[in-house]
Amino acid sequence: AICHEAGKTLALTLSDAFCVDRWRDEFRALVENEVDILFANESEITSLYQVADFDAALQEVRRHVHFAALTRGPKGSVVLRGEEVHVIDAVPPARVLDTTGAGDLYAAGFLRGLTMGLPLAACGRLGSACAAEIIAQYGARPERPLLPLLERVAGRS
């Protein structure tokens, strides 16, 4: 990948189980050979590996992917890197109005934590906090800056 030639890291979000179903072989080749950090929700990852449940998908991820953050809605998330496995609790939202953008905001918070040099569990907590913030409003763009939230959550990590 061009980014690797430039010394950069490639993160990918699977984004939609329908797309994964349609382009499974291409996604698997990309995920298993090029992607450094994989983000996926439960539906997307079970679709990618054509398995019936999250635990089976998790085993496939552990065999084929070095670094992944897998979201499970109110069940939280699981972060894997090599032999490390972190189960992250979901941050309860003030209310659930619209889940559009939850995965994107999880990834944004997680990557922010990674760039801050935080441990993986703390990165997962940042992602969960950002996801909780976005689902408590309508639309996928935060209504207010998230930096204060990130700093507050990171300070507790």
Question: Predicted segment positions?
Answer:
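Short beta-strand/loop segments at the ligand-binding rim of alpha/beta enzyme cores
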Residues: 6-15
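A conserved, positively charged/aromatic
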Residues: 31-33
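A short beta-strand/loop micro-motif in the catalytic core of glycosyltransferases
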Residues: 35-41
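Active-site beta-loop-alpha junctions enriched in small/polar residues
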Residues: 15-17, 43, 73
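Conserved phosphate-binding/catalytic region of the ribokinase-like
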Residues: 2-5, 24-25, 29, 50, ...
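Active-site glycine- and acidic-residue-rich loops that bind
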Residues: 17-23, 48
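A short, active-site helix/loop in glycosyltransferases that binds the activated sugar's phosphate group
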Residues: 41-50
